[in-house]
């Protein structure tokens, strides 16, 4: 930190209690200056030689008030009461010591107060050459404002000294100094700065690191929001800093200034009005460029803004929804279901209908699946209808697998054991059994929470997969009878049908044999077993479904649908779900 020492005489100011200051001298004091609740017992001559304002006050023989300063004669001492002086007693003492020629040290923390007080006391060059105003200006221009961190400290102090600091343009000069350095080419940054992000090493070797583009953002986080807004506006006005760096600055500021911003749970806030205004200001400062801030930052800011009751929530909600495909599950878990639905709606509206953005939709589908799985643990706040409403919004979105859908359904069934068969049927329509991974299938076939019809479907498609993967023939090894995964004509009566437990066990046994044969890696015997297993499973399925045929419940290999075209069932599922 830069500093400047003024004067050479030893400091002879003494204290008597908390409210009395005097100069230890052989000469009796002849003037009392009252600043606030502190009395200074001083000598006229040193003060008169450097302060035009004190000259006027002391030489005035009347008791008239001049800008709320009054003079009284008291025991051969003039008593001057100064109602207000920038910086209070501390800054006046600096000026008084300068008048006496005593040693006083100026630095970034007290220089603005001293400058404002010197201006108030009219300590100009016209009164005496080399006066305090001149010396402080030299110190500011040649030292303080040439230092990155000192400029920030000084800017902080200007707020408590407004409007004096504004009238003397001290605030503006600090802002210009900060903006000029933040906007400079990073290759010319030679001063120290705070940067806590991990710096990558080039090729694993320890080399001098290039200065990052956002090197300045953390140092500005200590600024009050009013000054921070002005600093950012001044930096942006120079046009040399990109929008994404401004976004990084806002992110760093939010993390430091908004309680619990980066935490996964709400925190207790005592001053809602303060932090509400802070969050609103940050939202207003976000650049218009879409990628100027990360999606994670937006989702966290939306969460905080809703919690604080901010005014700018609507606009922020749109920005989050438009980029919902970039959101992380951890960032949205504190959102309620209604908010998630509105974000998905914004996402859908923001998509160009002429473009099929498969990747973005798949990301949103994965996000919603994970959200529903986690939210299902909170059974009180996620009833079936809300679950279905949100899930159906993304039911048509592309997915590589339906494992996420299955996990969400299973978690919901686990937390809602009171569900009846009709409700279970509705929720299970969201899942396409053909798109479950082998691991999900293995879990599903043992899952007693699923309706038996769904278990049968999973068993069947798992058998088809195992049969096709393991068969040595190039022909169609799909069984002749396929139960529809999503039938439009199923009824509650079907759910009450008594499935033969022995048949289900037989299916599971056949599948176990298929897996075992595959793992043995004996192609000749494996081929025989796989073929035999496939036929065995087909016979079990035929037995299982015989006598229970319904319209749309069976698809024959010679019918209109084939094992690879169960998409028709998916479409009918969509129309069915709308009926509920």
UniProtKB/Swiss-Prot annotation:
<dbReference type="InterPro" id="IPR000210">
    <property type="entry name" value="BTB/POZ_dom"/>
</dbReference>
<keyword id="KW-1003">Cell membrane</keyword>
<dbReference type="GO" id="GO:0009908">
    <property type="term" value="P:flower development"/>
</dbReference>
<dbReference type="Pfam" id="PF00651">
    <property type="entry name" value="BTB"/>
</dbReference>
<feature type="domain" description="BTB">
    <location>
        <begin position="29"/>
        <end position="108"/>
    </location>
</feature>
<keyword id="KW-0833">Ubl conjugation pathway</keyword>
<dbReference type="GO" id="GO:0071944">
    <property type="term" value="C:cell periphery"/>
</dbReference>
<feature type="compositionally biased region" description="Low complexity">
    <location>
        <begin position="553"/>
        <end position="580"/>
    </location>
</feature>
<dbReference type="InterPro" id="IPR027356">
    <property type="entry name" value="NPH3_dom"/>
</dbReference>
<dbReference type="InterPro" id="IPR011333">
    <property type="entry name" value="SKP1/BTB/POZ_sf"/>
</dbReference>
<dbReference type="GO" id="GO:2000012">
    <property type="term" value="P:regulation of auxin polar transport"/>
</dbReference>
<comment type="pathway">
    <text>Protein modification; protein ubiquitination.</text>
</comment>
<dbReference type="Pfam" id="PF03000">
    <property type="entry name" value="NPH3"/>
</dbReference>
<comment type="subunit">
    <text>Component of a complex made of PINs (e.g. PIN1 and PIN2), MAB4/MELs (e.g. NPY1/MAB4 and NPY5/MEL1) and AGC kinases (e.g. D6PK and PID) at the plasma membrane. Binds directly to D6PK, PID, PIN1 and PIN2.</text>
</comment>
<feature type="compositionally biased region" description="Low complexity">
    <location>
        <begin position="468"/>
        <end position="478"/>
    </location>
</feature>
<comment type="similarity">
    <text>Belongs to the NPH3 family.</text>
</comment>
<feature type="region of interest" description="Disordered">
    <location>
        <begin position="548"/>
        <end position="580"/>
    </location>
</feature>
<comment type="function">
    <text>May act as a substrate-specific adapter of an E3 ubiquitin-protein ligase complex (CUL3-RBX1-BTB) which mediates the ubiquitination and subsequent proteasomal degradation of target proteins. Regulates basipetal PIN proteins (e.g. PIN1) polarization to establish inward auxin transport from the L1 surface of incipient organ primordia; this process is essential for the progression of flower organs development. Recruited to the plasma membrane by PINs (e.g. PIN1 and PIN2) and, in concert with AGC kinases-mediated (e.g.</text>
</comment>
<keyword id="KW-0597">Phosphoprotein</keyword>
<dbReference type="InterPro" id="IPR043454">
    <property type="entry name" value="NPH3/RPT2-like"/>
</dbReference>
<dbReference type="GO" id="GO:0005829">
    <property type="term" value="C:cytosol"/>
</dbReference>
<dbReference type="GO" id="GO:0016567">
    <property type="term" value="P:protein ubiquitination"/>
</dbReference>
<dbReference type="GO" id="GO:0005886">
    <property type="term" value="C:plasma membrane"/>
</dbReference>
<feature type="domain" description="NPH3">
    <location>
        <begin position="214"/>
        <end position="465"/>
    </location>
</feature>
<feature type="modified residue" description="Phosphotyrosine">
    <location>
        <position position="406"/>
    </location>
</feature>
<dbReference type="GO" id="GO:1901703">
    <property type="term" value="P:protein localization involved in auxin polar transport"/>
</dbReference>
<dbReference type="GO" id="GO:0071365">
    <property type="term" value="P:cellular response to auxin stimulus"/>
</dbReference>
<dbReference type="GO" id="GO:0005737">
    <property type="term" value="C:cytoplasm"/>
</dbReference>
<dbReference type="GO" id="GO:0009911">
    <property type="term" value="P:positive regulation of flower development"/>
</dbReference>
<dbReference type="GO" id="GO:0009958">
    <property type="term" value="P:positive gravitropism"/>
</dbReference>
<feature type="region of interest" description="Disordered">
    <location>
        <begin position="468"/>
        <end position="497"/>
    </location>
</feature>
<keyword id="KW-0472">Membrane</keyword>
<dbReference type="GO" id="GO:0016324">
    <property type="term" value="C:apical plasma membrane"/>
</dbReference>
<keyword id="KW-0963">Cytoplasm</keyword>
<protein>
    <recommendedName>
        <fullName>Phototropic-responsive NPH3 family protein NPY5</fullName>
    </recommendedName>
</protein>
């Amino acid at each position: 930190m830069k500093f400047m020492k003024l004067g050479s005489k030893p400091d002879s100011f003494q204290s008597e209690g908390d409210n009395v200051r005097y100069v230890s001298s052989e000469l009796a004091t002849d003037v009392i200056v009252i600043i606030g609740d502190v009395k200074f017992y001083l000598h006229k001559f040193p003060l008169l030689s450097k302060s035009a304002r004190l000259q006027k006050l002391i030489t005035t023989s009347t008791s008239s008030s001049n800008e709320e300063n009054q003079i009284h004669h008291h025991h051969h001492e003039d008593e001057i009461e100064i109602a207000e002086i920038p910086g209070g007693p501390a800054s006046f003492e600096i000026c008084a010591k300068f008048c006496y020629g005593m040693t006083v040290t100026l630095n970034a923390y007290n220089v603005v107060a001293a400058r404002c007080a010197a201006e108030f006391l009219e300590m100009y060059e016209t009164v005496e050459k080399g006066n305090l105003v001149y010396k402080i200006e030299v110190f500011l221009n040649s030292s303080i404002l040439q230092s990155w961190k000192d400029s920030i400290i000084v800017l902080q102090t200007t707020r408590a000294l407004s409007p004096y600091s504004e009238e003397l343009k001290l605030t503006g000069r600090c802002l210009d100094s900060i903006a000029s350095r933040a906007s400079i080419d990073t290759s010319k940054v030679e001063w120290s700065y705070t940067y806590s992000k991990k710096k990558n090493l080039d090729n694993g070797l320890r080399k001098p690191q290039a200065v990052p583009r956002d090197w300045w953002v953390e140092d500005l986080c200590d600024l009050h929001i009013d000054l921070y807004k002005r600093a950012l506006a001044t930096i942006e006005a120079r046009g040399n800093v990109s929008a994404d760096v401004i976004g990084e600055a806002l992110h760093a500021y939010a993390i430091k200034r908004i309680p619990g911003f980066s935490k996964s749970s709400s925190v207790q806030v005592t001053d809602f009005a303060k932090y509400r205004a802070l969050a609103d200001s940050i939202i207003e400062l976000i650049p218009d460029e879409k990628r100027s801030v990360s999606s994670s930052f937006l989702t966290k800011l939306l969460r905080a803004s809703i919690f604080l009751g901010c005014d700018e929530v609507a606009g922020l909600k749109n920005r989050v929804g438009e980029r919902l495909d970039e959101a992380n599950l951890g960032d949205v878990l504190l959102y309620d279901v209604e908010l998630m639905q509105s974000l998905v709606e914004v996402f859908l509206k923001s998509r160009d209908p002429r473009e099929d953005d498969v990747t973005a939709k798949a990301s949103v589908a994965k996000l919603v699946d994970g959200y529903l799985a986690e939210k299902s643990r909170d059974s009180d706040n996620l009833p079936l209808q809300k679950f279905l409403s949100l899930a159906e919004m993304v039911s048509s979105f592309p997915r590589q697998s339906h494992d996420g859908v299955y996990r969400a359904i299973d978690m919901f069934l686990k937390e809602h054991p009171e569900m009846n068969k009709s409700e279970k049927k509705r929720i299970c329509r969201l899942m396409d059994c053909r798109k479950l991974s082998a691991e999900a299938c293995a879990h599903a076939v043992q899952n007693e929470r699923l309706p038996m019809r769904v278990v049968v479907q999973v068993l069947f498609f798992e058998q088809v997969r195992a049969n096709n993967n393991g068969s040595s023939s190039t022909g169609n090894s799909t069984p002749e009878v396929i139960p529809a995964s999503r039938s439009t004509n199923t009824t509650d009566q079907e759910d009450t049908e008594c499935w033969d437990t022995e048949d289900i066990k037989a299916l599971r046994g056949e599948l176990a044999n298929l897996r075992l044969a595959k793992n043995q890696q004996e192609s000749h015997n494996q081929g025989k077993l796989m073929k035999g297993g496939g036929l065995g499973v087909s016979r079990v399925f035929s037995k299982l479904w015989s006598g229970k045929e319904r319209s749309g419940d069976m698809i024959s290999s010679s019918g209109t649908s084939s094992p690879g075209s169960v998409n028709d069932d998916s479409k009918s599922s969509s129309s069915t779900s709308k009926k509920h």
